[in-house]
């Protein structure tokens, strides 16, 4: 009969005007059951490692993407969706409580506090949060001609100012290689060899930076075209040596990561990271140490983002 079942009845709460989509009424037990059952089915029956929840900010804020008059404040006059907040706490408590080792990952683009905090500490309870700030600063820096990178040096160091505010995952996701944004290789400046050299440096810096890692498929062998769900990856590129070299380089970085605890065991502890020199602006060099918990198996990273050799 057209009566809203899963969404809010009031269109000011039940619709996203920009997307033309409905918003779940998280206060309804049947909606909560439907969503949590779906999450559990994927993890417990299909055995996926975890779930990434898209556009979390759109659920947390009642005024997300809306103008004055298009939204209704909560009972306290604020713009927080209290039902959605309670739902996320419940969802993550149930899923992670029943499935040890599973991951619940939030794609959340604002400064909402404690996204990965424990629900009993008023956190949302996610395992990891996408580090959207790092991703934006990092990709914008890497697009620059090395000659001009000195003017954007701070973009590569700023992420360490907030790196421990959440349990972050560094993401170079599908969102960054679609809609005319270019593949990771074609984001790099220069021609031919220069693009591949820049990509190697980028992946090395990412490996050393605190936070878990996510690299979208195809970028590990330097896919040329943007990703499209309508075709497979361009696997034929692996017949060419530069693409083989990138794949081997990324394999080696993963091996380095897996076999060196300094790269992950203190990811959420400031004691695990130390700048050696973050202010070498003129030469566009970043140097830092990743510390292991016992401080005996530390790793030094020196990343040079110019094509100039720096023997010292």
Model-found features: residue ranges?
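Substrate-binding/active-site clefts of carbohydrate-active enzymes
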Residues: 1-79
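Conserved alpha/beta catalytic core and glycan-binding cleft of carbohydrate-active enzymes
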Residues: 13, 47-49, 64-229, 258-268, ...
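Residue-level preference for long, well-ordered alpha-helices that form the structural scaffold
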Residues: 28-31, 35, 76, 80-84, ...
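Alpha-helical packing segments of well-folded alpha/beta enzyme cores
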Residues: 31-42, 87, 91, 202, ...
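Aromatic-rich peripheral "rim/lid" segments of glycoside hydrolase catalytic domains that contact
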Residues: 228-240, 250
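Catalytic cores of secreted or luminal carbohydrate-active enzymes
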Residues: 241-267
């Amino acid at each position: 009969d057209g009566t809203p079942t899963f969404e809010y009845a009031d269109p000011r709460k039940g619709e996203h005007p920009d997307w033309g989509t409905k918003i779940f009424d998280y206060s309804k037990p049947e909606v909560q059951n439907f969503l949590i059952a779906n999450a559990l089915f994927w993890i417990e029956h299909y055995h996926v490692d975890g779930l990434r929840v898209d556009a979390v900010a759109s659920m947390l804020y009642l005024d997300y993407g809306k103008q004055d008059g298009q939204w209704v404040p909560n009972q306290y006059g604020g713009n927080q969706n209290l039902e959605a907040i309670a739902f996320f706490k419940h969802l993550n408590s149930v899923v992670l409580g029943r499935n040890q080792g599973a991951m619940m990952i939030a794609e959340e683009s604002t400064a909402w506090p404690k996204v990965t905090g424990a629900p009993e500490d008023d956190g949302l309870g996610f395992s990891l949060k996408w580090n959207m700030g790092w991703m934006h600063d990092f990709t914008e820096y890497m697009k620059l001609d090395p000659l001009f990178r000195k003017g954007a040096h701070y973009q590569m160091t700023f992420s360490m100012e907030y790196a421990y505010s959440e349990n972050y995952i560094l993401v170079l996701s599908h969102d960054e290689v679609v809609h005319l944004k270019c593949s990771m290789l074609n984001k790099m400046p220069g021609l031919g060899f220069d693009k591949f050299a820049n990509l190697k440096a980028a992946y090395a810096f990412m490996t050393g930076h605190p936070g878990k890692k996510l690299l979208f498929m195809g970028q590990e062998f330097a896919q040329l075209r943007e990703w499209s769900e309508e075709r497979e990856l361009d696997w034929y590129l692996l017949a060419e040596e530069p693409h083989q070299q990138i794949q081997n380089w990324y394999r080696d970085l993963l091996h380095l990561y897996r076999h060196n605890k300094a790269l992950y065991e203190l990811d959420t502890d400031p004691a695990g990271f130390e700048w050696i020199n973050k202010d070498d602006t003129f030469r566009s060099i970043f140097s830092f140490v990743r510390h292991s918990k016992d401080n005996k198996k530390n790793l030094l990273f020196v990343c040079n983002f110019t094509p100039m050799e720096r023997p010292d």
